[in-house]
C-alpha cells in the first residue's frame, strides 16, 4: 500500500503540469515577463472513467518577488480506503532578473512517520541544494535554471507565454537532478464542456522512463488546460480535468 501512496504523490507531479496554463490565465500572460497573479484551482482526477479524487492548486504572492505554491491531493469515495490522507507539495520561490529561483520544497503523504517525505533547500549563493528525500541525504550542485517539480511550472508558463517552445528543463527529483524534455505535438480541436476549443498539445518525458505526460492547452482561453493525461508504457492510467478557477 505504501508504494501506492508514493505513486499517488507522483501523480501530484502530473497534476501540477496543468498549472502552467492556469498561471497563464491568472497572469493574463501575453507578456512572459509579467509576474503571475494569485489563484486557486480545483481539478478532478479521473481513473478509468471514475472520478478518484480532486487536486487543489494554490499560488500566493508573499512579497514583491516571492511566492508560495501548494498542491493538495485528496481521494474520494472508495479510493479514500487506499489513500485516506491529503498528499501535499509546497514550493517557495522568487523571480530574480526574470529567472524563477526555487527556495524551498516539501512533499509528504500526510503520515507523521512517512519515509516518503521530501524536504529541500536551495542556496543560490553557495550553489547547493540540500535536504532529505525519502530519508536519504541530498547535497547536489545547483546549476542556473534548476527547478523543483512545482517551480518549473512558472518557468514553463513564461516560456509558452513568450511564444517559445521549451525543449527541456532540469528538475531535482527526490535525490537526483534529471532532464525532462518537452515536445510540442501540434494542435487539436476538442469537444469540451466549454464548447469546441482549439488546443496546443505538449508531451513531457525523460530518457530511461516509460512515463509520458500530455497536456491540451486552449490558446483562446489564455492556455487554460482542458485535458491532461499520464501514460505508463503506452497505457493511460490517469486523466485530469479542471473544475474551478478562482482569482482575487
Identify the role of each PLM range:
Residues 12-24:
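Bacterial N-terminal signal peptides
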